[in-house]
Curated annotation (Swiss-Prot):
Major place of residence: membrane
Keywords: Cell inner membrane, Cell membrane, Heme biosynthesis, Membrane, Transferase, Transmembrane, Transmembrane helix
GO biological process: heme A biosynthetic process; heme O biosynthetic process
Gene that encodes the chain: ctaB
Annotated protein name in UniProt: Protoheme IX farnesyltransferase
Compartments where located: Cell inner membrane
């Protein structure tokens, strides 16, 4: 039972969200880290991400039951109770905001609450109504990175918006590759994902390339705002070009295997970016 509720918290996604907040915190701390604030920020971000993930499972349980990829999740499979899952999700989000407000700062707590609201009540319903849902979803998806920056600085600065831009841009090829891989499943669940609405893949491939290409200059913004140094700048450009190359390969051969390669590159991109920030920070 406990394992099923852990699955509801989407630990893989929650870990990436928390890592993005860590990236924002590093960019907001060019001269020194406040260990205590960092700890509470990571905990609050993880709790919020887990709560939002759980509530998302509750909202989409009927549609998950229609899809092969998600039919065996705890709620559609009957291994977890929807009412209990709803309570757990709300509790986790409230705990996150309740921790961040007094122990980090009010602005970061507000961003966490805004992330939950936008993800659950804007992005989630849009997934079934418009092909632009992925683009809209980049906003709540990138807010935790901005929250990491505000946790370190207490304000919305150029470095924070640079971090937000990186995460927002990165999400498009990441989620479009996933949507392409499971487009038949999404069609069964009646989701209006771009590869479902436009099955030829032209727009999907073009957007993946476009946003991956945009990510290369956007990723350098922390250097231009003096929130990161030259080591990060030198490393993040080839990292972005490699990611871009996988999308170009997908454009030439729109198969599930090539889409999976884009997805893998996107999953490795964020840890790679954080590693570069750490090396840059320590050196």
């Amino acid at each position: 039972m406990l394992w099923d509720y852990l699955i509801l918290a989407k630990p893989e996604i929650s870990s990436v969200v928390t890592l993005s907040a860590f990236a924002g915190f590093l960019i907001g701390s060019p001269t020194g880290l406040d260990g205590g604030t960092l700890l509470w920020t990571m905990l609050g971000t993880a709790l919020c991400a887990g709560g939002v993930g759980t509530l998302n499972h509750v909202l989409e349980r009927r549609y998950d039951a229609q899809m092969k990829r998600t039919a065996q999740r705890p709620l559609p499979a009957g291994r977890a109770d929807p009412k209990m899952a709803r309570r757990v999700g709300i509790l986790l989000v409230c705990l996150a905001v309740g921790l961040l407000c007094p122990l980090v700062n009010v602005l970061t707590a507000v961003l966490a609450a805004l992330t939950a609201v936008l993800y659950l009540f804007v992005y989630t319903p849009l997934k079934r109504t418009t092909k632009w849902n992925t683009l809209v979803g980049t906003v709540p998806g990138a807010l935790p990175a901005l929250g990491g920056y505000t946790a370190a600085t207490g304000h919305l600065g150029a470095g924070g918006w640079a971090t937000f831009g990186i995460l927002a841009t990165w999400q498009m090829p990441h989620f479009l590759s996933l949507a392409w891989m499971y487009r038949k499943d999404y069609a069964r669940g009646d989701y209006a994902m771009l590869p479902v609405v436009e099955p030829d893949g032209n727009s999907t491939a073009a957007q993946m390339i476009g946003f991956a290409a945009l990510l290369v200059p956007v990723s350098v913004l922390p250097v231009l705002t003096e929130a990161a140094g030259w080591i990060y700048g030198v490393g993040v450009v080839p990292l972005g070009l490699w990611f871009l190359w996988t999308t170009i390969v997908f454009h030439g051969e729109r198969t599930g295997q090539k889409a999976k390669r884009v997805l893998k590159a996107s999953v490795l991109y964020i840890p790679g970016l954080v590693a570069l920030l750490l090396v840059d920070w320590f050196l």
